[in-house]
């Protein structure tokens, strides 16, 4: 096994885009701290894929709705991976509700996972990092308004502002950037056919795939002169 470039903590890394990012980071030379909450079997499968790349992987269960559990996550990871130098805030929840229909629990769930947890994870990550990078996974909706998913859209917008604010404060020791995917995967339980139908209205007239998101994440990590940037991986949907 070659010497790793460091270690990456990927939240929500058990499946979907998170699993693709975590596995790509392993291929790119990073050991991986794979966070999950309820998807234990999927996390174990992704961990095996990472280890097949010749890198170490450890699983970290944590409920990001719980502040105490969230506050303990980075210290737990550093016990296993002292060279933690990449944080990918990918964990997400996606629930439909307009402003009128959004209850307190749904609101807090979205803001806890999309904003509060990344805020405190970034804070803890930066405390003991002299050359690190944070990548926040957003959504192309941050460029507009989606009243059908009020809490989701607003919480992702808050994460975009955190990206910019943290980039200004934490440099040069820590760079902070974001990737905003568009039509990549349907929501859990959704169908690809619906995305393909909607993609006809995009400038590029097709849906993307997880490899497109992964490429943007790796580009940002590898480029030492980019911070505070958001890369839209959405086929032009944000235009």
Question: Where are these predicted regions, by residue range?
Answer:
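Conserved glycine-rich cofactor-binding loop
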Residues: 14-16
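Conserved Rossmann-fold SDR core element
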Residues: 25, 160, 170-184, 226-233
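The beta1-alpha1 cofactor-binding region of Rossmann-like NAD(H)/NADP(H)-dependent oxidoreductases
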Residues: 40, 61-72, 104, 210-212
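Active-site Tyr-X3-Lys motif and surrounding loop/helix of classical short-chain dehydrogenase/reductase
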Residues: 72-79, 97-101, 105-112, 197
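Conserved NAD(P)H cofactor-binding loop of Rossmann-fold oxidoreductase domains
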Residues: 90-95, 235-236
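Catalytic Tyr-X3-Lys loop
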Residues: 93, 100-119, 135, 152, ...
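Catalytic loop of short-chain dehydrogenase/reductase
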Residues: 96, 133-171, 183-184
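C-terminal substrate-recognition "lid" of short-chain dehydrogenase/reductases
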Residues: 128, 209-233, 238
